[in-house]
Each structure stands twice: as C-alpha cells, then as structure tokens.
Amino acid sequence: MLMVWILVSYWYMKYVEVVIYPPRNLGEKNMGAGLTAYFKSEFSNWGKGETIWLFSASAVILGLSLYWGDSLLGIIAALTGVWCVVLTGMGKSVCFVFGIVNVLCYAYISYGAKYYGEVMLNTLYYFPMNFVGLYIWNKHTNKETGEVDKRHLTNKKRLIIALGSIVAIVIYGVILKHMGGNLPYIDSLTTILSITAQILTLYRVAEQWILWMVVNAATIFMWGVNFAQGNENIAVLLMWMVYFLNAVFMYYRWSKEAKNNEI
C-alpha cells in the first residue's frame, strides 16, 4: 500500500497540478486544492443514464454480495471494478484510480481460485498500465467536455489485431496448461484479449469494447464455474456481468462519437 501511495502521489504532483491545473506560482502550489479541482472535474457533467447505471449496478452488487455472505475483499474488488469500467466508458481519467485498487484485490482473489493467468495479468500488466493510462488520458482530455477524445480503427488494423491475438491465445494456453491452471485456454483467452483491449483503451479507440465483450463473456463462464464449485465469489461474478453489459452500452456510445475519427 505504501508503494501505491508513493506512485499515486508522484503522478499527482507531476501531472495533475502541473499539467491539468498549473498553479500561478509553482513555488506556492496547493496540493489539496489541485486534487480537489481534479476530482471535481472528473465527477461533474455526468449523463443521467450513466449515473443511474453506475449507482444501480453498485447497489445490486453490494446487496447480493451481502446476502450471499461474500468476503469484504470481493465486494471491494467488485465495486471498484464497476466504477472503473463505467468511468472508462464515460471517458474520465479517474477510472484508472479505481482500477489500481481493483487489480490488487482481484489478483489476490484470482490466486486463491488458481486462475494464474488472471493473477499475472493484473499484477504484472494492469497495475503498471493504470499509471500509464492516467498520464495518457490526462494529456488527451477535451477541456470542454471533460472526456477523452474517441477514435476507431481501420479494417486493416482490426484484421492484424485479430490474427495476432489468436496465435498468442493458443501459445499462452499451452503454457498455462503445463502450469496446472484451471481452464487454461479460457484463462489464456481472457488474458491475451485483456492485454490487447487495454492497449486499445490507452489509444482511446472504440474497438476496445468489442474485445471487452469477449473477455467479459469468457470470464463470466470462468467465475461461474468457480461459484458452482462452492466458492464464495458471487461479487466477482456479478462484477463481470456488469462489465459485459457496460461494454455493450459503451461500444454503441464510443462508435457513435468516434465515427469521423479513424486511425
């Protein structure tokens, strides 16, 4: 936790105050005021539908998790995960702050379930990439809308990404099978596509949501099997269900907004 705080503090002092809200006098900058201004900006100008969706999903997860007696860690992972993906869809850079907490909690839960691909994905990839995302998205946030500018890929780039992902899934699946992991090829699929989707997220392209749909569907199956085996991870299972529905909605929104911005 100390390391997390150090990294967050470093990012804040270097990018939030200097890049987003540069003070008039750098020698007299007020860290508290800058942080307040940042979060005020991130949590303003929300659409009515998105706000209802975010709080409704959070309430359902919290209520059912408490009913089923899920662990506190599982509930924290689920709630921070939901806030992360919804805020990602809204184009708010603060999504990565929630993502940092989520990946640490989720990695611990995945280790207990022997989903080693998920553990490595979250600790070795998602965790550092959340800090990268904070930096990149802040640089490309539209000051008028408070959201990142959205784009979409050419057909050629879509084909290259699809073929490369298939090859990587097969290779990594073989590796996980030899490690003795549960559902190695499903685990591999979610890991490889998650890596690819996260890169597309950093580049702010609409196609990321297609990959997230596939990842979420496969992961729902994976955690459904885990829950059916008697494990108390209902919060995590519900989290992935919300992820899937969110990806469908956000793909429609991003595709519409990125229609004339091809890369």
Set out the residue ranges of the language-model regions.
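Short, Lys/Arg-rich, polar N-terminal cytosolic tail immediately upstream
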Residues: P23-S44
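N-terminal membrane topogenic signal
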Residues: F39-L54, T154-L159
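Hydrophobic core of alpha-helical transmembrane segments in multi-pass integral membrane proteins
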Residues: I52-S65, R158-I175, F244-A247
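Short, hydrophobic transmembrane alpha-helix segments
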Residues: I61-L72, M90-G91
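Membrane-helix interface "capping/anchor" motifs
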Residues: V86-V97, I199-L211
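Hydrophobic/aromatic-rich structural module bridging two neighboring secondary-structure elements via a short loop
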Residues: T88-I136
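Membrane-proximal helix-loop-helix units in multi-pass membrane proteins
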Residues: Y125-L193
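C-terminal transmembrane-bundle signature of multipass membrane proteins
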Residues: T201-I263
